[in-house]
Regions:
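Active-site-adjacent helical/loop segments in soluble small-molecule enzymes
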Residues: 99, 103-149
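A broadly conserved detector of short glycine/acidic/proline-rich loop/turn motifs that flank catalytic sites
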Residues: 21, 130, 158-159
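Glycine-rich phosphate/pyrophosphate-binding loop at beta-loop-alpha junctions
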Residues: 25-102, 155-174
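Nucleotide donor/acceptor-binding cores
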Residues: 41, 149-150
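Small/polar-residue-rich loop-to-helix segments that shape phosphate-bearing ligand pockets
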Residues: 1-39, 91-114
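Generic secondary-structure signature for well-ordered alpha-helical cores
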Residues: 9-13, 35-39, 58-62, 84-91, ...
Length: 174
């Protein structure tokens, strides 16, 4: 917009961070998540732009695996976006495309119930747009036995600033 351009002109050397941190520096910053001394088997993350997951994949060791849970419906296009950010061809990851709950910022009663029960059981808030969908998916994969005996790191990517608006819009308490 013109207003944004006017503000940028008043700054010496502005650096504009794209939505979702979806650029090479955002991906680089996320490499630190998986590039640690701790040896997790699997990294789990919600996906919006895919840059967090791409960074995690770039930082992984060869024996590690990553699973992303897109918040968007019909998000298979993220496969190509994520591949564009990868340092090398890596097949140790995939997207779980069936946990979007009707799409971005959409909800279903079972997701709301899950968020509420998760808060009561664990004392950790989940946002309904991204993180709750990924956590729900993780619990589902654990239930069906596909992650048995795996050391898992779930990355809570935040999003809590949107909870009050979501509660107001849908007349629910998370």
């Amino acid at each position: 917009s013109e207003k944004v351009k006017a503000i940028i002109k008043t700054l010496d050397t502005p650096y504009i961070i794209p939505e979702g941190g979806a650029n090479a520096l955002g991906v680089l910053g996320c490499e630190e998540i998986s590039n640690s001394e701790r040896n997790y088997d699997i990294f789990i993350s919600a996906c919006g732009t895919g840059s967090t997951l791409a960074g995690i994949i770039n930082g992984m060791k060869k024996n590690q695996y990553a699973i992303g849970f897109p918040a968007l419906k019909n998000a298979s296009f993220l496969n190509d976006k994520i591949n564009c950010f990868l340092n090398q061809k890596n097949q140790n990851w995939h997207l779980e495309l069936d946990y979007h709950f009707n799409g971005y910022a959409k909800q279903k009663p079972e997701l709301i119930k899950f968020i509420q029960e998760f808060w009561i059981s664990h004392g950790i808030r989940l946002d309904p747009v991204y993180t709750a969908k990924a956590m729900f998916g993780l619990f589902d994969l654990i239930k069906n036995g596909s992650l048995k005996n795996k050391k898992i790191l779930f990355i809570h990517t935040g999003g809590l600033q949107g909870v009050s608006g979501f509660e107001s819009r849908y007349k629910v308490v998370l």
